[in-house]
Amino acid sequence: MKNKFLAMVVASLMAGAIAPAAFAAASETTVSGGTINFEGQVVDAACSVSAGSANQTVTMGQVRSAKLDTVGATSGQKTAFTIDLEDCDTTVSQNAAVTFTGQEDSTQPGVLANTAGSGAATNVALQLYGPDGNTLDLTQESSAVTLIDGSNSLPFSVDYVATADGVTAGNVAATATFSLHYS
């Protein structure tokens, strides 16, 4: 009986000692969570470029190298993409055109060079097409699109193009920047 009583006293004392430690762990703590960068731009133009169009990735499907068997051959599988404009005011400008820049292929001027690096397909580049469906060389202004008040989508597309005979399989990547011209 004396042992039971002693065990109960020890257990009570231990519980009393542990309980404050448990409550101490529940106190408030502040830790560094990270950094958020905010970027934007104020423009004096007819429209603003939507956030989703400012930095986008256009995923192109696979194409067989046999479709790109001669210099200048395209896959015939254009991939569409748009540059979306918001808050357009046609009292400021009625038309918009786009100019793309990027690393030009060294053997075929006007097209985007394949910059995929390790594992890259060879003898292939990317050809841009304007809103009118015609080829759009780098640094060439696209055909103009007539704006409406509010939101507008400027349609473009891109296709694989052979820059030499003997296209080899591999990855294809390129980066283009664009600027808008309002008139």
Predicted regions and their residues:
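Mature extracellular/passenger domains of Gram-negative fimbrial/pilin and adhesin proteins
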Residues: K2-M8, P20-S183
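Bacterial N-terminal signal peptides
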Residues: V9-A17
